[in-house]
Amino acid sequence: MLILNQRTQQLATDSVALAYDERKRSRLKVTLASGAEAGIFLERGDHLHGGDKLAAEDGSAVVEILAAPEKLIEAIADSPLLFARAAYHLGNRHVPVQILPTENGGKLRFQTDHVLAEMVRGLGCSVSDAEAPFQPESGAYGGGHHHGDESATDLHNPGHGPHRSVPKIHEFKPR
């Protein structure tokens, strides 16, 4: 079994498609597109994004991480104000959200949760089911990618209580 534990920018020799919940895990056994078995071993709190590449410990392979399509809720706001309200209410609940532009307002994608879908519908968004790769925003406590020398934090740890981590300024990078 290949051991994938080093980030790299080298050209990929194989790939694996992972859903968001899988990309959040620091330890994961996967089957690559080639059929080979591999183990992903990352620092705790380190998360993968579609497009990331991991090198095998023995240097024999470079695997590109693909964001697998998954079932999501898509909320479309037809004005900037409605978009801001919907994003605020989802963010206030610490919901991982992918933000996408539209001509008039914006589009929010989040994991399937019918209570949240009804909430944003009640705010005035048009809501539908979608199947797409999910690449949510990292958030204030998630930072960007972690590359070993940076402190690792959990995207779902809002930083409350005595374990509170130092907030990081958002890193807005093209994906």
Curated annotation (Swiss-Prot):
InterPro entries: UreE, UreE_C_dom, UreE_N, UreE_N_sf. This is Urease accessory protein UreE. Involved in urease metallocenter assembly. Binds nickel. Probably functions as a nickel donor during metallocenter assembly. Belongs to the UreE family. Keywords: Chaperone, Cytoplasm, Nickel, Nickel insertion. Residues 134-175 are annotated as: Disordered. It comes from Dechloromonas aromatica (strain RCB). Transmembrane segments: none annotated. It holds the Pfam family UreE_N. One of its GO terms (biological process) is protein-containing complex assembly. One of its GO terms (molecular function) is unfolded protein binding. It is found in: Cytoplasm.
